């Protein structure tokens, strides 16, 4: 389930507090913003998510090439990016983007990896139209906000979801 911030009060400390609950297996805090990305003369607008390295495992989303960012990238607030298939195709066509620099907002980011293409959903939603950067980089360089927009919370066991949701509400 997701814990969402209706105000600007959900923080990384809140995510840590949720993570410490005995029924919680994983917490993935995130920020989200729609941004224009540029590579040479090509450009696109896509969703940029600031997430933690655990995002990939929590979402069970494999990489088709390259690698995901690390805890060290988070600590250093590195300008690195993992591209979804849609922005990768729009910016690079059939060319290999790994190691290339793309512009997001007013800064350049090095492409580390490519997410496996999922394809359009039945409702027409494109889950591949996204990019991922370290959450700390998003907070300090992109959104300039100290709060997070939401956090994906995974209970230790499906039977614990209701209890976990109640515990999160109590915080």
Language model region names:
Residues 49-73, 77-171:
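Mid-to-C-terminal secondary-structure elements
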Residues 1-47, 51-57, 89-90, 139-140, ...:
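Hydrophobic, regular-secondary-structure patches
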């Amino acid at each position: 389930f997701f814990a969402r911030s209706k105000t600007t009060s959900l923080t990384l400390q809140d995510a840590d507090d949720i993570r410490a609950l005995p029924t919680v297996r994983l917490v993935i805090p995130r920020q989200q913003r729609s941004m224009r990305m540029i590579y040479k003369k090509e450009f696109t607008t896509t969703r940029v998510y600031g997430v933690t390295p655990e995002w990939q495992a929590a979402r069970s989303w494999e990489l088709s090439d390259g690698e995901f960012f690390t805890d060290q990238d988070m600590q250093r607030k590195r300008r690195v990016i993992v591209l979804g298939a849609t922005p990768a195709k729009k910016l690079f066509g059939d060319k290999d983007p790994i190691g290339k620099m793309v512009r997001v907002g007013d800064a350049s980011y090095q492409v580390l990896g490519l997410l496996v293409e999922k394809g359009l959903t039945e409702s027409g939603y494109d889950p591949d139209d996204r990019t991922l950067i370290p959450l700390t980089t998003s907070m300090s360089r992109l959104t300039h906000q100290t709060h997070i927009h939401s956090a994906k919370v995974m209970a230790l066991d499906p039977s614990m979801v209701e209890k976990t949701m109640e515990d999160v509400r109590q915080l």
